[in-house]
Amino acid sequence: MGSVCSGGRYESLASDGKHAYPGVGISLGLTRLLAPILSRGELSSSRSVPSAVLVAVNAEEDRATSEAVAVALRSRGIPCEVAPKADKFGKQIKHADRRGIPFVWFPGVKHADHRDADTVKDIRSGDQVEADAASWNPPTEDLHPGVIGTR
């Protein structure tokens, strides 16, 4: 099976050329501990990816807008990803659903005299609201994946 935990003292762990410096270290095999629990179905995650939001791409020429939304969300600690390609919104929603991403962000479309508002959709409930990447937050329980115990 292998080691679960190891560690020790290392006499010459680092050197500046003239002096050798000792160090200590420890390693925990969390994957070795969790693998049997996960394989028995006693633990699972609330979603398979860390992203809470998929930012849709209206058209490839608008990808920069979607990337800018993603940068704004990430700068505020909201894990997100940009759709891999511009496609019908239904396909982008299905992509998010397959990956377990609860929200899809639709950047507003630019018109000659203005830009439509961005909207975000909770694909579980179908609720869709106007949103601003500088202030919108998902519910706390959706921000990061969680561990779910079955016992």
Residue ranges of model-derived segments:
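TRNA-recognition modules of translation machinery and tRNA-sensing kinases, especially anticodon-binding
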Residues: 1-151
